[in-house]
Structures are given as C-alpha cells and as structure tokens.
Amino acid sequence: MKTTILVVILGLTLLFALSAATELKDEERDCKGFQVKCKKDSECCSSYVCGRQWKWCVYPSPFGR
C-alpha cells in the first residue's frame, strides 16, 4: 500500500515536471501567435500581421491595408 502511494506521487511529480518543461519550450518562440499583443508586423508569425486598431497579431485582411 505504501509503495503504491509512493509510486503514484512519483508519477504525478514526473508528469508535472514534463508538462512544465513543455510549457517553457512554447514560450521560447521567436514570433507571436494569433491574438497576442504586438507593436509591429515583424513580431508576429509569418501568417499574421499586427492589427492597426488593437495591436494584436491577426490574419491579414483580404481587402488590403
């Protein structure tokens, strides 16, 4: 019984550590994704532009700027 609880706690700790490492890797991206605050187009990923009104990375307008 005690070893089972210990194994469960160890497993949960390992799962937490792996998920935290994955989350840190996502934050290290060079560009910003959809609806993330930006100041200029070069901060957004290649398929997005920095919106003029709210300064978020959004899809480019089909009607031009």
Curated annotation (Swiss-Prot):
Belongs to the neurotoxin 10 (Hwtx-1) family. 32 (Jztx-16) subfamily. Disulfide bonds join C31-C45, C38-C50, C44-C57. The keyword Disulfide bond applies. PROSITE patterns: HWTX_1. This is U11-theraphotoxin-Cg1b. It comes from Chilobrachys guangxiensis. Probable ion channel inhibitor. It holds the Pfam family Toxin_12.
